[in-house]
């Protein structure tokens, strides 16, 4: 198996090293793992693509490239340049430093990389490691993803139907904020929503007198609906959410039919 990996935390992020190990084990002795990851931090860029400027790509080592762009840019560079003569069988994005469950999904560059791969017609999985008191205190906060990542990806690939239909399918995997041995299992999950304040701004004044704002995130440990991603993560489960690049509110099509003329 040939696997392309990317992330949004950057080429030197520890989560990318975890993902490389996961991908290496998945690819097997006869497989290949290729890395095309952002040269700089790209967290929160979503599905951004840099079509208004050129993108510099530098080779950092064997099958290892850094691109001055977003995770989606990196996937495009991997598919249409770096690996153009022999495309990958699978694209993995992550392992993100922090969860991409609930509304975080909508901002995530990690998700953006997987979504772009799906739009390009490839199997794609985003992987993220929830942070919390129970895994922040251990030597490797990525322990849960490192220990269970191979099994989760193998299960997803084994159970994905040959024909997925409609808009391209991809997966969002979030590992719980617990040590690896305390993971309770794997659960299919819906995308949750954390009620209350999400992102906001915090004003500051520079010594020069100029005013600026920091973007602040909300409480990541607020519960979400039963059976949804963040709730299951906080209970100790790995969540697997199948997703599509389709933002249509299908449940509103019939109630809004009166709009038609």
Curated annotation (Swiss-Prot):
Q: What is its main location?
A: cytoplasm
What is the cofactor note? Binds 1 divalent metal cation per subunit.
**One of the Pfam families matching this protein, by short name:** SurE
Q: What is its EC number?
A: 3.1.3.5
Give the keywords, sorted: Cytoplasm, Hydrolase, Metal-binding, Nucleotide-binding
Q: Where in the cell is it found?
A: Cytoplasm
Keyword Nucleotide-binding listed? The answer is yes
- Where a divalent metal cation binds, per the record, is at 8-9, 43, 96
Task: Decide whether keyword Cell cycle is in the record.
Answer: no
Show the catalytic activity: a ribonucleoside 5'-phosphate + H2O = a ribonucleoside + phosphate
GO molecular function (one): metal ion binding
Q: Which cofactor is essential here?
A: a divalent metal cation
- One GO cellular component term noted in the UniProt record for this chain: cytoplasm
The enzyme's first-digit EC class, named in words, is: hydrolase
The record's listing under HAMAP family reads:
SurE (MF_00060)
Under NCBIfam families, the record lists: PRK00346.1-4 (NF001490), PRK13931.1 (NF010541), surE (TIGR00087)
Family, similarity comment: Belongs to the SurE nucleotidase family.
Instruction: Tell me the PANTHER family matching this sequence.
Output: 5'-NUCLEOTIDASE SURE, 5'_3'-NUCLEOTIDASE SURE
Summarize the protein's role: Nucleotidase that shows phosphatase activity on nucleoside 5'-monophosphates.
Which protein are we looking at? 5'-nucleotidase SurE
Native organism is Roseobacter denitrificans (strain ATCC 33942 / OCh 114)
Q: What is the lineage of its organism?
A: Bacteria, Pseudomonadati, Pseudomonadota, Alphaproteobacteria, Rhodobacterales
State which gene encodes it. surE
């Amino acid at each position: 198996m040939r696997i392309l990996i990317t992330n949004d935390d950057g080429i030197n992020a520890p989560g990318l090293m975890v993902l490389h190990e996961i991908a290496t084990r998945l690819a097997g002795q006869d497989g290949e793992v290729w890395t095309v990851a952002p040269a700089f931090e790209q967290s929160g860029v979503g599905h951004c693509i840099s079509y208004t400027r050129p993108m510099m790509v530098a080779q950092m080592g064997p099958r290892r490239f850094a691109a001055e762009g977003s995770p989606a840019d990196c996937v495009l560079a991997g598919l249409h340049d770096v690996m153009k003569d022999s495309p990958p069988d699978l694209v993995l994005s992550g392992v993100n430093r922090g969860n991409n469950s609930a509304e975080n999904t909508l901002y995530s560059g990690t998700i953006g990389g997987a979504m772009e791969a799906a739009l390009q017609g490839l199997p794609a999985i985003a992987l993220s490691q929830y942070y919390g008191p129970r895994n922040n205190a251990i030597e490797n906060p990525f322990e849960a993803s490192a220990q269970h990542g191979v099994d989760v990806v193998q299960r997803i690939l084994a159970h994905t139907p040959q024909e997925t239909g409609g808009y391209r399918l991809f997966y969002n995997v979030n590992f719980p904020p617990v040590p690896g041995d305390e993971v309770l299992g794997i659960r299919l999950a819906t995308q949750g929503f954390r009620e209350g304040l999400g992102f906001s701004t915090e004003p500051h004044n520079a010594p020069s007198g100029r005013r600026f704002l920091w973007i602040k995130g909300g409480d990541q440990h607020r519960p979400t609906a039963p059976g949804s991603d963040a709730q299951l993560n906080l209970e100790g489960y790995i969540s697997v959410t199948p997703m599509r690049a389709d933002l249509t509110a299908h449940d509103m099509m019939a109630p809004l039919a009166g709009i038609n003329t």
